[in-house]
Regions:
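A glycine-/small-polar-enriched, mobile loop at the entrance of the PLP active site in fold-type I
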Residues: 2-61
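PLP-dependent enzyme catalytic core of the Aspartate aminotransferase-like
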Residues: 5, 332-361
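Active-site C-terminal subdomain of aminotransferase-like
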Residues: 14-15, 191-276
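Conserved beta-loop-alpha segment that forms the PLP phosphate-binding cup at the N-terminus of a helix
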Residues: 54-83, 87, 91-95
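Active-site phosphate-binding strand-loop segment of PLP-dependent enzymes
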Residues: 116-172
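Conserved active-site segment immediately N-terminal to the catalytic lysine
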Residues: 179-191
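Conserved PLP-binding catalytic core of the aspartate aminotransferase-like
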Residues: 284-315
Length: 361
């Protein structure tokens, strides 16, 4: 397997040496020892600060898709109704996933290069009256950031729906106040801004959501049941990953030492530099306007004189790895990940200079 000197894919991101150190030690029995539960509680508290929430934090093993499934299976009955707010691949994915559960799922859809219109979402919810509304904060394949979570959250509250938000690739790198947005279940992955491998999934869960979860009683592997009182009852539904939990603790403390405001500014500066350099070399931004671009990832059209496989191969030959794309964007749009450890001006500048050298041959 080849290692790339300059990693700018939009997750999993480069892992800092300080975080890697968590895997250099041996730990005890994580589901029995007080030391582990103390670490778990500290990570809960630090994550609440990161997300600006008082809601419960649940930290489970596995990649973030596991909690996207959990957020649906634990809150929807087969006769339930879900409204997926979609301006991209992952927004659509919520509806597709719900459909496999026998749920009545509708999509309030918007073009991939735009963001949701909160009035259209409100009107759709008023007529449909869903049990759950889902939204995606950062559509990573599109490089867009949804600015209207608070408006959608108010609509969800008005119509009695739970509000589920995928902020896997935005939390910690973008302005986000989960409680202000009335987010009932928020979904975060470890491999983006937190700069870990894809080993942990983190959910913020409101009391409203817990009531629904207890009523639905889904008990499969991804279930939130059993996690509500983990620190108090000193019991885990399965053996947790102590190494990953320690790595998460290191990551969260690194963020807090730097300061949340400074971390957000660092992401904004890296994004701004990436787009400025892209403009200078003639790259076209995929989002319709720079104002809806995410601070954590930038999506550019592949230059017309190149194919994506050609460009990707030439960049990798120079030691640079960036992100391709999925679905209808595959081969047409590529992405620069400047999140977490990669929100670094020198790293972004070096990577963009290599892109310049290859597209301007």
């Amino acid at each position: 397997m080849k290692n790339y000197r300059i990693g700018l894919i939009p997750g999993p991101v480069r892992i800092p040496e300080e975080i890697k150190s968590a895997w250099q030690n041996d730990y005890g029995s994580s589901d029995l020892e007080e030391e582990f539960f103390t670490l778990y509680r500290e990570n809960q508290s630090l994550t609440q600060k990161l997300l600006h929430t008082k809601n419960d934090i649940v930290i489970t093993s596995g990649e973030a898709m596991s909690i996207l499934w959990a957020s649906l299976k634990c809150t929807l009955r087969p006769c339930g109704k879900l409204l997926a707010v979609s301006s991209g691949l992952f927004g659509e994915g919520f509806a597709e996933m719900a459909g496999t559960l026998g749920v009545n799922a509708e999509i309030c859809t918007f073009p991939y290069d735009e963001v949701p219109d909160p009035q259209k979402v409100y009107d759709h919810a008023r007529i449909f009256r869903p049990d759950v509304i889902t939204a995606v904060h950062c559509e990573t394949p599109s490089g867009t950031l949804t600015p209207c979570l608070a408006e959608i959250g108010r609509a969800a509250r008005e119509f009695g729906a739970l509000f589920v938000v995928d902020f896997v690739s935005s939390a910690g790198g973008c302005e986000l106040d989960a409680d202000e947005c009335n987010i009932d279940i928020g979904l975060l992955g470890s491999q983006k801004v937190l700069s870990l491998p894809p080993c942990l999934s983190i959910s913020s869960i409101s009391q409203r959501a817990w009531e629904i979860i207890r009523g639905v009683k889904y008990s499969g592997y991804e279930s939130y049941l059993g996690w509500e009182n983990v620190p108090r009852q000193h019991f885990m539904p399965y053996t947790p990953d102590w190494h990953a939990m320690k790595a998460l603790n290191i990551s969260l403390n690194m963020i807090m030492r730097e300061g949340l405001t400074s971390v957000l500014e660092r992401h904004e500066e890296a994004a701004k530099l990436c787009r400025e350099l892209g403009r200078e070399m003639g790259l076209k931004l995929f989002p319709k306007s720079e104002g809806i671009s995410s601070p954590t990832v930038t999506a550019f059209y592949v230059p017309e004189n190149l194919t994506w496989p050609e460009l990707d191969a030439s960049l990798r030959a120079k030691g640079l790895a960036v992100g391709g794309n999925y679905g209808s964007l595959s081969g047409k749009v590529f992405r620069i990940g400047h999140m977490g450890s990669q929100a670094d001006l020198e790293l972004v500048r070096e990577g963009m200079n290599i892109i310049r050298s290859e597209i301007m041959k």
